[in-house]
């Protein structure tokens, strides 16, 4: 029962998780065992096949009620974005201080909504996921972060500007992001490196 509750809470926090991600997070040894555990939870979770033919799970209505989740998730082609974010969560040691889509705003100057905001080794980080996003949108995001940096608001509040972490799909996109992020403290991962 505790394991079921923990799985439901993970789905509440991260929205969508693949079977392999759930295995890593909750020690579900072996594919058969993982499928059995997740099949026994069908009353609380729904699933669909992802791009790589692996099941992707999310809370259904009963599961949302059980853990007090108000966000409704259904089958979506954007699941890859959420899976990339979940892999970043696992890579950064399943941080309890992890918050998704937290708004940072300096009125009438700039607003930034990172995919996640978290603390790792006592340092704050912004996470941005680049899953099939148009590069001009990524450029706009970087420009907004640079505007936020230029205001000095976060530096005054926490003593420094948080490190930017990007997860992207290709080396060429990584290089372009590195170029644009010049002047910011940034780490850029390829998704395959952190899976």
Named regions from a protein language model:
Residues 1-72:
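Nuclease-adjacent, charged terminal/linker segments that flank catalytic cores
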Residues 131-184:
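Catalytic cores of nucleic-acid endonucleases
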Residues 11-12, 70-105:
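Acidic-basic catalytic patches of nuclease active cores, encompassing PD-(D/E)XK
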Residues 116, 121-127, 159-167:
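Hydrophobic beta-strand segments of well-ordered beta-sheets in folded domains
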Residues 189-191:
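Residues that scaffold, gate, or flank divalent-cation-dependent active/transport sites
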Residues 21, 87-91, 144, 176:
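Amphipathic alpha-helical segments that form well-ordered structural scaffolds
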